[in-house]
């Protein structure tokens, strides 16, 4: 069974607007509406939307029988956001995490991520000519995945990496919940980063698969 968690609690400060960023429009629809369509196209059994900034407006936009909203009262990071919804997921389900302001990822790429998570955890990366602002995918000398480092925590060498973390990942609800409970906030932003679960999966000798998207994220 597939469940989707959509993160929609952000403020959209980079858009210089008081409107929640997921409510900005694309092709006449709020960004989050496009992401909901994607979740339904993937035949998700249940859809969870994590709300925060402008919660009432976002909830009104996403309201539907197949959508359950969860409040992130404090903005403590993406890992903390997922924690607000993971407890409502069936432990045996596969959980796909999407961002409510990233509407243009193809269904095929997301299906690849879900399929790759069968035995462990999978994430979606992309190659950018200008990766500024994104977390970087760190690999060893043999090209094997090591982890994701956020830009504010990255070394100059790591900031030169063009492979970025899109934020999309999938894993079983049971494993994801356990890893989230181990994530700490010892980083430059004092936040609980969702990508830290990838490193915890490696520590547990669980397979980590990186699916590289053909989408243009520039």
Per-region residue spans from a language model:
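N-terminal nucleotide-binding beta1-loop-alpha1 segment
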Residues: 1-17
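Structural beta-sheet core signal
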Residues: 4-6, 48-49, 96-97, 123-124, ...
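Conserved N-terminal catalytic core of the sugar/cofactor nucleotidyltransferase
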Residues: 29-112
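Acceptor/aglycone-binding surface of glycosyltransferases and processive sugar-polymer synthases
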Residues: 128, 134-147
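Conserved donor-nucleotide/metal-binding helix-loop-beta segment in metal-dependent transferases, i.e.
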Residues: 108-132
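Short glycine-enriched, charge-decorated loop/helix-capping segments at active-site entrances
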Residues: 19-25, 183-186
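Short aromatic/basic micro-patch
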Residues: 25, 104, 170
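Catalytic-core segments of class I nucleotidyltransferases/pyrophosphorylases
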Residues: 145-218
């Amino acid at each position: 069974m597939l469940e989707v968690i959509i993160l929609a609690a952000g403020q959209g400060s980079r858009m210089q607007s008081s409107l929640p960023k997921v409510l900005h429009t694309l092709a006449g629809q709020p960004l989050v509406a496009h992401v909901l369509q994607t979740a339904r196209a993937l035949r998700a059994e249940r859809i969870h939307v994590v709300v925060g900034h402008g919660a009432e407006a976002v909830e009104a936009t996403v309201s539907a029988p197949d959508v359950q909203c969860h409040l992130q009262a404090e903005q403590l990071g993406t890992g903390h956001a997922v924690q607000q919804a993971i407890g409502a997921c069936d432990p045996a389900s596969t959980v796909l995490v999407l961002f409510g302001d990233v509407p243009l990822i193809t269904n095929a790429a997301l299906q690849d991520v879900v399929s790759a998570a069968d035995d462990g955890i999978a994430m979606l990366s992309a190659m950018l000519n200008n990766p500024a602002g994104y977390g970087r995918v760190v690999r060893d000398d043999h090209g094997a995945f090591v982890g994701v480092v956020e830009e504010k925590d990255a070394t100059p060498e790591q900031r030169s990496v063009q492979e970025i973390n899109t934020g999309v990942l999938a894993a079983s609800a049971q494993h994801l919940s356990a890893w989230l409970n181990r994530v700490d906030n010892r980083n430059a932003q004092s936040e609980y980063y969702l990508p830290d679960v990838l490193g915890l999966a490696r520590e547990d000798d669980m397979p980590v698969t990186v699916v590289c998207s053909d989408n243009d994220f520039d």
